[in-house]
Structure formats: structure tokens, C-alpha cells
């Protein structure tokens, strides 16, 4: 029998995962969490399902409902995955440290990795991301590279090494961009209208 279609739901009291046609029943191995949760999402590949609660982030194997990993970050308001689910990205509300400096509130984690007993997961990279709009990184289809939009440019990184900018695409006034989902690795940038300049969308290979 083919794998059933699946959907998840979030209410004020908890989260559930349901196998739809042809079985229409709750996912057998999933223990429904209770209490407040801020957000939830599937990975684009459908392999993982994650949600954020007051205690942290939990990731399960969507096919069986078993917990894959937990992230020790309790203030998450947005969740995202890379295309193949290798990385999970979290966004927390902007805040400052004792010196008034902005804390790095966008964090990238490996979804599944072996962790020694007594150790916690370590972030792959982190950034200051003030806006909740367009907060997430964008990845190439093979997850080799990822990118984010900053003032007047799009910065590209090797996905496993986020401490060093791999290359930059300079675009004065850019506010948004998109990486093509296929193998040609084109990038489109959006530059909004300003004074006499009209909206501009540029497609760059």
C-alpha cells in the first residue's frame, strides 16, 4: 500500500499529526505535545516535522512520529528547513545584551546528528535578523550554498561554514531575492520603487 497523505494541525491546546487517505487516523507513533506552541512546520522534503514551544524546539520523523532531536532554544517564533531537511533554522524575537548590542537571533542547526551523552546541540551559524519578514535563509536545491539579504547586497555562504561570506551580490536598494529551485542556480533580486526609479527585478546567473 502506498504511503498515506499526511497533515498536521496546531491548536491552543496542542499539536497533532494525522495520516489522511486512505487511513484517516492519527500517526500511531506520535505523542501529542500539550500546552502552548508558537509555530510548526514540515521540512520541504516531508521527512521531518518540527514545532516550537516555551521549552524549546522538537523535531520528529514524520513517517513514524518519533523524536529525532530537540533544540535548547525556548524563545523561537519562526521555524524553517533547508530543501532536503539537513538544516533547521530558528528565529527568535530581536533582543539586546547588557551592553545594548543586538543578539544573534537567527540560528542554523543540523537536523540529525549524533550527540554524545551530556552534550547539547551546537549551532552551525547565527546572525542578527531584526525583521520577521523574509527572515529565513534561502538554499540552493542541493543545499551546497545558502544566502541572506542584508543592506544593499545578498550574501552567499557554504552551508556548512556560515562564519565566512563565500561571495556577495551587490544590488543597491535590494529588499528581497529568490534562488531558483533547480540546478541552474539563478538568483532574482527585487529593488523597490524609490522617487523616480521604478520597481526592478533582476535575474542573475
Where are these regions (language model features)?
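Blade-terminus and WD-like Trp-Asp/Gly-His loop motifs, strongest in beta-propeller folds
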Residues: 1-4, 38-48, 78-87, 136-145, ...
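Structural motif
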Residues: 12-17, 56-58, 96-107, 152-157, ...
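Short loop/turn segments that connect beta-strands within beta-propeller blades
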Residues: 20-23, 62-65, 111-114, 159-162, ...
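Short consensus segments that form the blades of beta-propeller domains
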Residues: 6, 48-49, 95-101, 145
Amino acid at each position: 500500500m502506498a504511503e498515506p497523505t499526511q497533515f498536521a494541525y496546531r491548536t491552543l491546546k496542542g499539536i497533532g499529526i494525522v495520516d489522511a487517505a486512505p487511513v484517516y487516523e492519527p500517526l500511531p507513533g506520535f505523542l501529542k505535545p500539550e500546552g502552548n506552541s508558537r509555530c510548526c512546520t514540515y521540512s520541504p522534503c516531508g521527512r521531518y516535522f518540527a514545532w516550537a514551544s516555551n521549552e524549546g524546539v522538537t523535531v520528529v520523523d514524520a513517517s513514524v512520529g518519533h523524536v529525532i532531536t530537540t533544540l535548547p532554544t525556548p524563545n523561537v517564533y519562526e521555524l524553517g528547513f533547508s530543501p532536503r531537511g539537513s538544516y533547521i533554522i530558528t528565529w527568535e524575537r530581536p533582543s539586546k545584551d547588557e551592553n545594548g548590542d543586538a543578539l544573534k537571533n537567527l540560528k542554523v542547526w543540523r537536523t540529525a546528528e549524533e550527540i554524545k551523552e551530556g552534550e547539547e546541540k551546537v549551532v552551525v551559524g547565527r546572525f542578527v535578523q531584526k525583521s520577521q519578514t523574509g527572515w529565513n535563509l534561502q538554499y540552493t536545491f542541493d543545499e551546497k550554498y545558502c544566502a541572506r539579504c542584508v543592506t544593499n547586497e545578498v550574501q552567499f555562504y557554504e552551508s556548512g561554514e556560515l562564519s565566512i561570506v563565500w561571495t556577495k551580490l551587490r544590488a543597491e536598494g535590494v529588499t528581497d531575492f529568490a534562488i531558483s529551485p533547480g540546478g541552474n542556480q539563478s538568483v532574482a533580486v527585487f529593488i523597490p520603487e524609490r522617487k523616480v526609479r521604478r520597481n526592478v527585478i533582476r535575474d542573475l546567473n
